[in-house]
């Protein structure tokens, strides 16, 4: 090959595989080596890559540094496409995920190979350091010992100590945690069921007897212990004799419900109430005598005052209800003791409402049967009450 052909310039089109830069056109000579071409590329290419970081690929072939371009390039081509690949010196875009997988792989391989000998520990540490991974506080990477089970704290003496409250979420379940976890869930279920049972009892008897504060404060102050028998609870003192308010509305938590719609009425509500009363009185006035009109007004006023709580008509039933309240209190205490014993022994109540007594129990008489006068008065008062709008409910005593 003559000297003119060797010194003739050729055109190379440098293409980047990541498409970060546009294709660059470089003029060189056939007598150049690949190493000289790399140095020229490091000067003219936009990213200024180092020569040792460059990899040139031509027609699917990796070009070595000692090769000359005349031995590689095809003579019939006018433009020669060369792909430039540069080794990245910057850290990867997602080092957290890579380190996580690398640490997981190294931990699993260390746990498998730590049994035969401890002589491979320096080589593993050197390999981990070369990969850019740092194991801080990991006994498997520093001392070559088996890692402690997940969710177990290591004592200074080397004895495993299980954490309180069971294993954390997402961790693998260890066989030693199964009894502890089942016991912990059983205690939580028992406490929740105990609180719900007391709330239901307080809501059921709130209309007749005020709930005892000692029973409602029991679960919050002293949790149920599995190995200690529950102390017997003495009968609570009988509540004071006071009339119960039958118009109390109860909410789901067992307390009196505050109805904002009844307490905060606007002028439209009052206008509607007055118009209903005026229509009723006008009908009675025009279609009856004056005496009947006065009687209806008096009856309406009496019923309204009764609903407002000024004239209670159930004073004769206060003492029987107080006695029934004391009897119900003793029965509820007995039911509480029975339920606590069943929860302490870990027995679930599958028989339904086992604490309720039947109507044939001689110690628990049936409810008070109203007389003829009470039934007649209830019928008449209910009839007139349905015609008169109700007033706002009174607060609990």
Swiss-Prot record:
GO biological process, alphabetically ordered: endoplasmic reticulum unfolded protein response
Domain Ubiquitin-like: 10-89
Region (Disordered): 87-166, 210-246, 344-373
GO cellular component: membrane
Comp. bias (Low complexity): 88-123, 210-220
Transmembrane regions: 293-313
Protein's membrane topology: Single-pass membrane protein
CDD domains: Ubl_HERP2
Primary location: membrane
SMART domains: UBQ
Pfam families given in the database record: ubiquitin
Acidic residues: compositionally biased ranges: 345-360
Keyword entries, A-Z: Membrane, Transmembrane, Transmembrane helix, Unfolded protein response
S-adenosyl-L-methionine in keyword set: no
Compartment list: Membrane
Its job: Could be involved in the unfolded protein response (UPR) pathway.
Protein name: Homocysteine-responsive endoplasmic reticulum-resident ubiquitin-like domain member 2 protein
Organism: Danio rerio (Zebrafish)
Gene that encodes the chain: herpud2
């Amino acid at each position: 090959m003559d000297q003119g052909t060797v010194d003739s310039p050729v055109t190379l089109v440098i293409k980047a595989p990541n498409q970060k830069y546009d294709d660059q056109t470089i003029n060189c000579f056939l007598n150049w080596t690949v190493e000289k071409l790399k140095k020229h590329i490091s000067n003219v290419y936009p990213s200024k890559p180092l020569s040792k970081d460059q990899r040139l690929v031509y027609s699917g072939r990796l070009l070595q540094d000692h090769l000359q371009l005349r031995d590689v390039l095809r003579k019939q081509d006018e433009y020669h496409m060369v792909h430039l690949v540069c080794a990245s010196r910057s850290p990867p875009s997602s080092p957290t995920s890579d380190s996580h997988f690398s640490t997981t792989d190294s931990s699993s391989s260390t746990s498998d190979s730590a049994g035969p000998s401890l002589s491979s520990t320096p080589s593993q540490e050197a390999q981990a350091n070369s990969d850019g991974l740092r194991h801080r506080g990991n006994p498997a990477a520093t001392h070559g010992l088996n890692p402690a089970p997940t969710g177990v704290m290591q004592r200074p003496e080397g004895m495993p100590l299980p954490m309180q409250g069971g294993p954390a979420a997402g961790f693998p379940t260890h066989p030693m945690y199964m009894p502890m976890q089942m016991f912990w869930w059983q205690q939580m279920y028992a406490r929740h069921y105990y609180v719900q049972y007391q709330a239901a009892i307080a809501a059921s008897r709130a209309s007749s007897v005020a709930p005892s504060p000692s029973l409602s404060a029991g679960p919050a102050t002293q949790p149920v212990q599995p190995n200690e028998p529950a102390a017997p609870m003495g009968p609570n003192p009988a509540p004071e004799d006071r009339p119960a308010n039958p118009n109390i509305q109860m909410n789901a938590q067992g307390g009196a419900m505050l109805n904002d719609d009844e307490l905060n009425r606007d002028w439209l509500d009052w206008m509607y109430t007055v118009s209903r009363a005026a229509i009723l009185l006008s009908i009675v006035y025009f279609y009856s005598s004056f005496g009947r009109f006065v009687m209806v007004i008096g009856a309406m006023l009496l019923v309204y005052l009764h609903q407002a709580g000024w004239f209670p008509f159930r004073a004769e039933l206060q003492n029987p209800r107080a006695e029934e309240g004391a009897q119900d209190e003793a029965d509820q205490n007995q039911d509480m003791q029975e339920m606590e014993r069943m929860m302490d022994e870990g027995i679930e109540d599958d028989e339904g409402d086992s604490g309720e007594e039947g109507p044939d129990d001689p110690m628990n008489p049936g409810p008070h049967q109203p007389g003829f006068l009470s039934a007649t008065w209830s019928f008449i008062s209910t009839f007139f009450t349905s015609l008169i709008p109700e007033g706002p409910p009174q607060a609990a005593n």
